[in-house]
Amino acid sequence: MSWIDRIFSKNTTSNSKKSNVPEGVWTKCTSCEQVLYRDELKRHLEVCPKCGHHMRIDARERLVALLDKDSIVEIAADLEPKDILKFRDLKKYKDRLSAAQKETGEKDALITVSATLYGMPIVVAALNFSFMGGSMGSVVGSKFVQAAEKAIELHCPLVCFSASGGARMQEALFSLMQMAKTSAVLAKMKEKGVPFISVLTDPTLGGVSASFAMLGDINIAEPKALIGFAGPRVIEQTVREKLPEGFQRSEFLLEHGAIDMIVKRSEMRETLANLLSKLMNMPSPFVEPELIQEKSDDV
């Protein structure tokens, strides 16, 4: 074999090895830009193991990681959006819906379930940002209301994970109506003494932040989540000024009293269980039975 044949042979072998690596095995952190093994990132619940950056996570993956195994029962799973206004921008609304449904496997942006968390009954809603930016339309509003009413019926807490760009413009006034609708059912929950915990994730903006997302009895945020009404770019263009560093991020909002606490995704399950046990006047799931017995003997 001549020297030129050997070079071509090496190149061919190298290219063939590269092509054998399946797509999607590796990904890059959107913050530190470290190359990460996809399965490892999934094990860390989409949190970068190098820098701790919280990336966006699929709503169903979040629910499975949070709730007790085999306890999840979906609420209002049959609701599906309709193009009542025959809305069209660059595309028809019905085409956008079809594309989002095909991409995510969901009928709309909100998933609502009843389940248990460390054995405690709970109702949970989670917005999926991958479905049209987690935007709130009539189905999202209706599913949220049904979840809240289920929580009232069971007299158990409602927890909502928000990840949304706001109201869905393709539904116009129908989407704006959901702001009042969701706020009204939360007022009803308050009257009945049923707690609501709102968890704000990246991003929570627009009509969602201006309605149910900021109405929790306790408002929690994930680290460095973007939270506000308009995004920072829009604000800067409007006021023609540079915003402070970290403006509208979780840490800024906590410092200024707009939220109650910041909780890492890996600690969310235990934190929620502790909070809910206190709100519902139930024993903490992390107190050992022997300790409870010792306390009762002392009394």
Curated annotation (Swiss-Prot):
One Pfam assignment: Carboxyl_trans
Protein keywords: ATP-binding, Cytoplasm, Fatty acid biosynthesis, Fatty acid metabolism, Lipid biosynthesis, Lipid metabolism, Metal-binding, Nucleotide-binding, Transferase, Zinc, Zinc-finger
Assigned protein family: Belongs to the AccD/PCCB family.
Name of the protein in its database record: Acetyl-coenzyme A carboxylase carboxyl transferase subunit beta
InterPro entries (UniProt xref): AcCoA_carboxyl_beta (IPR034733), Acetyl_CoA_COase_Trfase_b_su (IPR000438), ClpP/crotonase-like_dom_sf (IPR029045), COA_CT_N (IPR011762), Znf-ACC (IPR041010)
Phylogenetic placement of the source organism: Bacteria, Pseudomonadati, Pseudomonadota, Gammaproteobacteria, Pasteurellales
The protein's enzyme class: transferase
Cofactor(s) demanded: Zn(2+)
EC number(s) reported in the record: 2.1.3.15
Assembly behavior: Acetyl-CoA carboxylase is a heterohexamer composed of biotin carboxyl carrier protein (AccB), biotin carboxylase (AccC) and two subunits each of ACCase subunit alpha (AccA) and ACCase subunit beta (AccD).
Predominant place of localization: cytoplasm
BP terms from Gene Ontology: fatty acid biosynthetic process; malonyl-CoA biosynthetic process
Cofactor: binding comment: Binds 1 zinc ion per subunit.
Pathway: Lipid metabolism; malonyl-CoA biosynthesis; malonyl-CoA from acetyl-CoA: step 1/1
Localization annotation: Cytoplasm
Species per Swiss-Prot/TrEMBL record: Histophilus somni (strain 2336)
Intrachain disulfide bonds: none
Biological role: Component of the acetyl coenzyme A carboxylase (ACC) complex. Biotin carboxylase (BC) catalyzes the carboxylation of biotin on its carrier protein (BCCP) and then the CO(2) group is transferred by the transcarboxylase to acetyl-CoA to form malonyl-CoA.
Zinc finger (C4-type): 29-51
Catalytic reactions of this protein: N(6)-carboxybiotinyl-L-lysyl-[protein] + acetyl-CoA = N(6)-biotinyl-L-lysyl-[protein] + malonyl-CoA
